[in-house]
Amino acid sequence: MLSVPGLNKLTVCVLIAVLLAAMAGCQAVALAGVMADTFERTGSHKVYADYKGLEGKSFAVIIAADRVIQGNDSRAITRLTNGIIRKLAASKDVHGANGFVPGVKVLEFQYNKPRWATWSYGRLADEFGVERLIFIDLQEYRLGEPGNAYLWDGVLSGKVGVIEADGMNPDEFAYTKDIRVKYPDQTGVTVNEQNRATVQANLEDRFADRVAWLFFDHEEANMIKY
């Protein structure tokens, strides 16, 4: 979409039509091409929720990761849990959930119950008192290629699953989706060009976006890089 403050897509299209009508021949064709390209590069489009079952329900988000991921960064789960819940909480008027468990409560539970990963999904949902449990199994989290301490090549991936505790099968996922994001977008970015905190923050924010966006309608840039 053309980057014109205060103008919606319909208004922009009408203005384009008026401009083209006032021109003729090659000029009109050239202008149409430029405008179409600008629209594609700077515009956005609506993306509908992949899972709509949060409406009218309470939810919790819990993240599991293997010892390698946790050993490399013991705070990763804390940051991701809070980041994802924060994005979902900020959009509660869109997805329509009627309540959620704060990240600090989930993390406190995980700390106090170190064997929680052996619990059934239904039991976890009951523990939090929610109708929907968003369970995220982190599968890969790295900031660079193994053995290369000089170039950034961040990857964060995981499987998102939703348990419907009030459904017929509270111990089985009613919905699943694989998520994978990368940062930086270009190769060859060195540790001197960007620091660890920047790479980490961008990678985790992209992952949190992709998880949260599964649950509500939203706008995405046409040329989004993740």
Language-model segments: residues:
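Residue-level signal for secondary-structure boundary sites
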Residues: I69, G144, D166-M168
